[in-house]
A protein has these predicted regions:
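Extracellular/surface recognition and adhesion modules
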Residues: 1, 42, 58, 87, ...
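Short, surface-exposed linear motifs at loops/turns and structural transition points
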Residues: 1-62
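Structural signature of tandem-repeat unit edges
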Residues: 64-68, 85-93, 111-144, 154-168, ...
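Leucine-rich repeat
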Residues: 75-80, 103-113, 150-151, 346-348
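Well-ordered, non-membrane alpha-helical segments in soluble/globular domains
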Residues: 96-109, 142-147
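Consensus positions within tandem repeat domains that build extended binding/scaffold surfaces
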Residues: 147-150, 170-173, 249-252, 271-274, ...
Length: 384
């Protein structure tokens, strides 16, 4: 077969914006016209002569944008800003670019709506760089960081693939993205905090090359799979934690829809606000858990029954705020030490109605405790 040879008017250009290893390279070519077909020849020249490789035909589309310089996204898109529902981006992006991207997703700088309906974003080859204006109220871009509120309140967003060199995902970077179903975490991420209000989120995937995090059935864990860090709100029903889990991170199950949790007895640590505002109805805490931290079940408006293990020694402030508790089962023979607001609630007080079940013969200890004695119904009860 005859090889196609570039014509006299073909442009010869040395391109160096490439990445990759031995055997495969990725070349980024900018300033191409949208919806245009290009013919590209690899060309090399040395003292021994020159060579031209086989022609590659490539047609640009209107859903892929390559930035040569940070801050130029708005000018590249011009009047087509709100025409995109899916988009692949590459190149450097600063605060101006990310503010423009938020407009495409339906949000102005002042959080008012725009006509934008961008739903699917591939940012694999994007480099987030400091500079430019804010992307939100007093929020400025840092190098390699998905900042707090970057995707906040973007109702149309369903899927996002993050840049491969991102190192940090701040708390609530995706807050209130109510259509977001899937997030892909790249290998480079070493610091990550969850986002609240992602009611449709069912799947958090992590690159197998990431040495800090992992994912099992769409749930974000640490690399050793001993700590749950982020449980997707969109998962429903019953959830049994893997037997390898020994701890739950701060706010890991916040606002989740699971009603029944089965926690392994070898778990020894639960983070602050771990189940805050979730739909849990009944929970049996692990036998080895020593402390129930601040706001563990705060805002769990369906939680009625809590079972506390024999090794629990302390309960922190507002652990059960706004919970309509009817029964607390405590296996500890001595009353766990409680902070002064351990059972304080902004809702209807449960101190007069909730029954505290304690080990046989131990009711007197609880009735004599400065905090536990606030409950009007404490009884020795061997039932579990």
């Amino acid at each position: 077969m005859e090889k196609e040879i570039p014509g006299k008017n073909a442009t010869k250009e040395i391109l160096t914006n490439y990445s990759g290893g031995l055997g495969q390279q990725k070349l980024l070519i900018g300033k191409l016209t949208l919806n245009t077909t290009y013919k590209i020849w690899p060309y090399a020249k040395s003292r021994m002569g020159e060579t031209i490789g086989d022609c590659i035909t490539y047609t640009t589309t209107n859903d892929a944008i390559m930035l040569q310089e940070a801050g130029e996204l708005q000018s590249l898109l011009s009047n087509n800003l709100y025409d995109y529902t899916s988009l692949t981006l590459a190149g450097p992006m600063n605060g101006d670019d990310l503010n423009c991207l938020r407009k495409m997703m339906g949000r102005n700088l002042d959080e008012t709506n725009t006509p934008g309906k961008l739903a699917s974003i591939n940012m694999t080859d994007v480099k987030i760089v400091a500079g430019g204006g804010p992307y939100g109220a007093n929020r400025y871009v840092q190098d390699h960081v998905i900042g707090q509120g970057l995707f906040a309140n973007c109702d149309y967003l369903t899927n996002v693939i993050l840049p491969t060199d991102v190192t940090t995902i701040e708390k609530d970077a995706f807050i209130n993205c109510k259509s977001l179903a899937k997030i892909e975490i790249p290998a480079s991420v070493s610091n990550l905090l969850p986002s609240s209000g992602c009611t449709a989120l069912r799947d958090i995937e992590v690159s197998e090359a990431n040495s800090n995090y992992s994912s099992v059935n769409g749930v974000l864990l640490n690399a050793q799979q001993t700590n749950i860090l982020w449980f997707p709100m969109g998962k429903q029903g019953e959830y049994s934690l893997p037997s390898t889990i020994t701890s739950i991170g701060n706010y890991a199950f916040k606002e989740c829809s699971i009603e029944t949790f089965i926690l392994p007895d070898n778990m020894n640590e639960i983070g602050q606000g771990a189940f805050m505002d979730s739909k849990v109805k009944e929970v049996k805490l692990p036998a080895n858990l020593k402390r129930i931290p601040t706001s563990t079940f705060q805002g769990c408006k369906q939680l009625k029954v809590v079972r506390i293990g024999s090794k629990t020694e302390a309960i922190s402030d507002y652990a059960f705020d706004l919970c309509p508790l009817t029964d607390i089962y405590v296996e500890a023979k001595l009353p766990p030490v409680c902070s002064s607001h351990a059972f304080t609630t902004r809702g209807t007080s449960f101190l007069n109605t909730c029954i505290v079940h304690v080990p046989t013969g131990k009711a007197a200890f609880y009735k004599g405790d400065v905090i536990w004695k606030q409950f009007k119904n404490i009884k020795s009860d061997s039932s579990k």
